[in-house]
Amino acid sequence: MPTAIFLMGPTASGKTDLAIELCQALPCDIISVDSALIYRGMDIGTAKPSAAELALAPHRLIDILDPAVSYSAADFCKDALREMKEIAERGRIPLLVGGTMLYFKALLEGLSPLPSADPVIRAGIEEEAARLGWQALHDELVRIDPVAGARIHPNDPQRLSRALEVYRISGKTLTELTQVQGEGLPYRVLQFAIAPSDRAVLHQRIELRFDKMLQGGFEQEVRALYQRGDLTPDLPSIRCVGYRQMWDYLAGEVEYDEMRYRGIVATRQLAKRQMTWLRGWSDVTWLESGESGNLARVVARAGVA
């Protein structure tokens, strides 16, 4: 069974630097596991690897979609499995790097057999929402699937629409279908998580990075997206941390200082969610951010596999 390496961690933990070092030490090819890096024209706010970093270690599954397009965990699994197969067939090691834990989980455990999106049914749901309001549709979801209804907020039209769509297509609730597991990953997976052990250090790194983004032209980047006219705040791309807060600022809803504050807080909340996922993860080797021995530890594990 071929080997694959997962390098997971919260935002601003040093994943990219370590991944590039690994590519110099091992026959690895990087696959990005990040629901924001997939989008073109979203470079600064996603801390996308620089041209120099990409020259050292090309990343697959970045810059693959326009921000107007949605992308699901199922889409990611299909794309990642294709890339992993191609890398392994060349005798190299797929190195999957990122912080979108849902993608890692879906890849590792296999996806539930959810039906594909149906544009006609989805349009019908949108029409009902326009006529009755999303709260009425949320009430319907609570009746048919109380578990999903408790988890999905009435103000989350994307997930609410998907839950209703799944039921109308299949006759089964989202909760029923997600309890059915798909096929696992046909690789020997070495799993690593990198993060600072001191939460205050991570918070400081997040604040420094957000300010660096602001100084590096983040406002201009989001303004270009804002001025396109075809993007809305409920799209997954614009809901990305930092982008939503800057969007609100450009829309005149918040002042600049408030935007900065909210962006930093939202990024810290994202990091907290990522750490919560990782603490519940089984069979993971923890690495301390910035520690000099990290590369040697990963290389040693890979050599044993």
UniProtKB/Swiss-Prot annotation:
Pfam families hit by this protein: IPPT
Amino-acid positions noted as binding substrate in the UniProt annotation, renumbered to this chain: T11, A12, S13, G14, K15, T16
Record keywords: ATP-binding, Magnesium, Nucleotide-binding, Transferase, tRNA processing
Chain positions covered by the region annotation Interaction with substrate tRNA: 34-37, 158-162, 239-244
Record protein name field: tRNA dimethylallyltransferase
EC class name: transferase
Alphabetized SUPFAM superfamilies for the sequence: P-loop containing nucleoside triphosphate hydrolases
Residues where ATP binds: G9, P10, T11, A12, S13, G14, K15, T16
Known partners and oligomeric status: Monomer.
Catalyzed reactions: adenosine(37) in tRNA + dimethylallyl diphosphate = N(6)-dimethylallyladenosine(37) in tRNA + diphosphate
Gene3D superfamilies linked to this entry: 1.10.20.140, P-loop containing nucleotide triphosphate hydrolases
Cofactor(s) needed by this chain: Mg(2+)
HAMAP family per the UniProt record, alphabetical: IPP_trans
Keyword Nucleotide-binding: yes
